[in-house]
């Protein structure tokens, strides 16, 4: 339990029963409620200031502890050794009648509320009310409250547990000009980066669109070139076919003329059966003619042989005309079959040969006609193939044109969609949205995620606000959502601060002598911040007391702010180890919870009276609420 160290005074002359004292009651007049905090402040004053600041009574109590086995420390009977009630007290009172236990709890709570273990940030000045002082003089005092409120912003309300006590406290974030300026610079930088990113994205999008258009144009040009090439090939093929057709026609005309010149008699004479029979008879009689006929039939005859064979044909024609005039009908052969004979077989062979010969001669004489027919068939086939090829080419060209058109339409639609594209909203679950909203910090709180200074205020005593210990160890309990803060209170901190100031001034003077030109304006402040007097050899011995408190009811979204509001863990641990190494821990006192009914009657009465006053002040405060 923290105790306020006071000067112990002992006097030889003591009074067994001090004079009766009258204590001024707290004012219970009607007050205005212009501000809820002001009302709470005045009520909290009645509970703590009026009783707790009466140090004259502590001095009077010290007189009552003369020649007693205990001393008066912070208005309470205490000793370094453990109390021995049986040997020291003749008529020991009960714990309830002594009032030490209850008054010690009030004193301990007052010590916490008055921030003996915290660094003071602000304290409201007391109002001095008198008949000569007009009411208008209170305006400057009342004006300081809004000024203080403008310098900080509420973070949250929570419950603080310290020792055996539980307090309702309020945490504030102290405004810092450096952090505000840094935040503003970061926001401007983010804005510039965002604007630059937007421009880069727009430029990249424009380049992509241009590249896409260029590729589409290249594809379109390639398609057009392909179609033009196909058209040119088609026209070229058509011209080649027409030229080939004309060439063949000219060749056919030449062949016809040649055949007309070569062919003397009509082709119908070659089919005269009488002439063929006469020719076969002539071949039977003339072996030379038979050989010539065979040569002509095989197609091995030359021009002279053909001319000679034509002469034999003319002779056979003349004989047929003489034997078979126009008015005479040809003789009809008997249909009765005759027995086969060798001569007949020979005659049949000659007849077949003659027929073959006639066919060969007919083929030779009328050669241009089948060639012409073959050429016409070939031309028809080629024209059909050309037509089919042209039709298929035309169909392919039409398909390609349709594909190009469809791709153009699709690309235009895609381009329009990209231009008018709307980013679809993500569908998120309601629980996730609610959790995200709960975890969101305000714009002001986001500025102080790093390096915030937390201010603490007791709701039951709003006249003062204190710094949360900067050099402390913060531990987060995930199971109970509680925060444990541990730090070391140095009781002779003023002495150490004086030593620090003296050392800094000495170092600055030495540095100015050595480096006058290199001196910078902000170097003094940096040295003052970085300098730690505890690590100096001649540092005063720190008198310390370790402290621990627990905060509960803080939303986890503020954990990051609280974690980063204290100094780094390595630095804090290093300083704590140094304090434990060179410092002296203050020993605690043992309270005497029982007093003697006769020897300590006045002390017991004083403790009970103070306890009643405190209870009355708390009761009136609850009643007004």
UniProtKB/Swiss-Prot annotation:
**Subunit text:** Component of the SWR1 chromatin remodeling complex composed of at least ACT1, ARP4, RVB1, RVB2, ARP6, YAF9, VPS71, VPS72, SWC3, SWC4, SWC5, SWC7 and SWR1, and perhaps BDF1.
Q: Name one GO biological process term.
A: chromatin remodeling
Q: What else is known?
A: Present with 1380 molecules/cell in log phase SD medium.
The protein's location, in the record's own words, is: Nucleus
Q: Where is the composition biased (Basic and acidic residues)?
A: 194-214, 221-234, 342-352, 368-388, 396-420
Give me the Gene Ontology terms describing cellular component: chromatin; mitochondrion; nucleus; Swr1 complex
- In the UniProt record, the signal sequence range is none
Give the similarity note: Belongs to the SWC3 family.
Protein keywords: Activator, Chromatin regulator, Nucleus, Transcription, Transcription regulation
Please report the name of this protein according to its UniProt entry.
SWR1-complex protein 3
- Region called Disordered, residue ranges: 1-53, 194-234, 254-273, 324-434
Q: Where is the composition biased (Basic residues)?
A: 20-31
| Role of this protein | Component of the SWR1 complex which mediates the ATP-dependent exchange of histone H2A for the H2A variant HZT1 leading to transcriptional regulation of selected genes by chromatin remodeling. Involved in chromosome stability.
């Amino acid at each position: 339990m923290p105790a306020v160290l006071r000067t112990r005074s002992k006097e030889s002359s003591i009074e067994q029963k001090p004079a009766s004292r009258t204590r001024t009651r707290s004012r219970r007049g009607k007050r205005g409620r212009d501000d809820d905090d002001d009302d709470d402040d005045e009520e909290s004053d009645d509970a703590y200031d009026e009783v707790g600041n009466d140090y004259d009574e502590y001095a009077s109590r010290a007189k009552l502890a003369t020649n007693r086995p205990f001393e008066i420390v912070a208005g309470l009977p205490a000793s370094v050794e453990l109390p021995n009630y049986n040997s020291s007290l003749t008529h020991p009172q009960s714990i309830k009648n002594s009032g030490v236990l209850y008054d010690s709890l009030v004193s301990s709570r007052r010590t916490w509320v008055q921030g003996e273990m915290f660094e003071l940030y602000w304290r409201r000045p007391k109002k001095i009310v008198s008949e000569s002082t007009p009411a208008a003089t209170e305006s400057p005092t009342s004006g300081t409250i809004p000024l203080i409120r403008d310098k900080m912003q509420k973070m949250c309300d929570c419950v603080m547990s310290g020792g055996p006590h539980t307090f309702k406290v309020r945490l504030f974030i102290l405004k810092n000009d450096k952090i505000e300026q840094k935040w503003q610079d970061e926001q401007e930088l983010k804005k510039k980066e965002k604007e630059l990113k937007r421009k880069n994205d727009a430029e990249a999008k424009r380049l992509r669109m241009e590249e896409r258009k260029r590729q589409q144009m290249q594809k379109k040009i390639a398609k057009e070139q392909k179609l033009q090439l196909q058209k040119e090939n088609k026209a070229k093929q058509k011209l080649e076919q027409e030229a080939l057709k004309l060439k063949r026609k000219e060749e056919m005309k030449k062949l016809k003329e040649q055949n007309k010149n070569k062919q003397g008699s009509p082709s119908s004479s070659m089919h005269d059966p009488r002439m063929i029979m006469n020719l076969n008879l002539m071949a039977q009689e003339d072996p030379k003619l038979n050989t010539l006929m065979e040569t002509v039939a095989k197609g091995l005859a030359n021009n002279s042989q053909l001319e000679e064979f034509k002469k034999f044909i003319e002779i056979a024609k003349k004989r047929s005309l003489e034997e078979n005039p126009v008015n005479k009908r040809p003789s009809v052969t008997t249909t009765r079959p005759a027995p086969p004979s060798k001569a007949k077989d020979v005659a049949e062979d000659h007849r077949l040969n003659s027929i073959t010969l006639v066919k060969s001669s007919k083929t030779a004489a009328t050669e241009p006609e089948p060639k012409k027919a073959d050429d016409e068939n070939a031309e028809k086939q080629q024209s059909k193939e050309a037509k089919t090829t042209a039709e298929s080419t035309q169909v392919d060209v039409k398909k390609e044109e349709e594909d190009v058109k469809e791709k153009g339409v699709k690309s235009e639609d895609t381009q329009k969609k990209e231009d008018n594209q709307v980013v679809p909203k993500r569908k998120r679950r309601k629980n996730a949205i609610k959790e995200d909203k709960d975890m969101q910090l305000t714009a002001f709180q986001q500025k102080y995620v790093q390096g915030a200074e937390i201010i603490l205020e007791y709701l039951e005593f709003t006249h003062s606000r204190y710094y949360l210990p900067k050099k402390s160890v913060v531990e987060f309990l995930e199971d109970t959502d509680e925060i444990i803060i541990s730090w070391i209170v140095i009781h002779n901190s003023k002495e150490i601060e004086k030593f620090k100031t003296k050392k800094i001034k000495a170092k600055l003077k030495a540095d100015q002598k050595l480096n006058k030109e290199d001196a910078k304006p902000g170097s003094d402040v940096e040295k003052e911040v970085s300098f730690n007097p505890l690590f100096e050899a001649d540092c005063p011995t720190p008198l310390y007391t370790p402290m621990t408190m627990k905060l509960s009811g803080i939303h986890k979204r503020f954990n990051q702010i609280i974690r980063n509001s204290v100094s780094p863990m390595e630095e804090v641990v290093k300083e704590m180890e140094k304090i434990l190494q060179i410092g002296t821990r203050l020993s605690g006192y043992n309270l005497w919870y029982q007093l003697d009914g006769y020897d300590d009657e006045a002390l017991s009465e004083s403790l009970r009276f103070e306890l009643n006053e405190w209870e009355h002040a708390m009761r009136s405060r609850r009643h007004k609420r």
